[in-house]
Amino acid sequence: MTTANLTKVIVPCRLSYAHLWEPDSINGSEPKYSVSCIIDKNDKETIAKIKKAIEVAKDEGKGKWGGKIPANLKTPLRDGDIDRPEDEAYADSMFLNANSKQAPQIVDIQVQPILDQSEVYSGCYGRVSITFYAYNSNGNKGVAAGLGNVQKLRDGEPLGSRANARDEFEAVDAEDDFLA
């Protein structure tokens, strides 16, 4: 890589609403791969890099916005305590939603492809490659987060309402044929 892409950031985060294996359609929109990246507010270095990349994307987007940065510009970095106060996974965190029409490459800590879809899920921790870009679509102007690749770093408590089968059931003796 000869020139630095100033709009690209590798974001250490907790994955939420992870649609990384199959594209998902939201409200009838075009299906996309997506993830919500939950970033600890104490990770000031990552948050600063994201803010800098958003500023670069704003500057690069002036051409799409008539030569100036609009006052009511939508940006992707949000405060979980303000925008998601009811969701404890977002407490004391910043977050952003990233998406792409193209499937991300998903790798482990050794940068080997992960093929087992159950290995990467909402609640695990990883790093996500994000490229920030300006848009002007149907009168909406802003900076969006483009989903790149994903690296799983470690497991975490799964997010969502689905219960773990081990918590719901106990082993049954094969000789106990209670359905007979």
What is the predicted function of each stretch?
Residues 1-95:
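OB-fold ssDNA-binding interfaces and closely related basic DNA-contact patches used
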Residues 1-7, 157-180:
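Acidic, gly/ser/pro-rich intrinsically disordered tails
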Residues 18, 101, 131-133:
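Generic short beta-strand segments
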Residues 39-41, 132-134, 154:
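Beta-strand elements of well-folded, non-transmembrane domains
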Residues 98-102, 106-115:
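A beta-strand/beta-hairpin structural motif
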Residues 110-126, 133-143:
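Exposed beta-sheet edge/beta-hairpin loop segments within beta-rich domains
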Residues 137-157:
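OB-fold/S1-family single-stranded nucleic acid-binding modules
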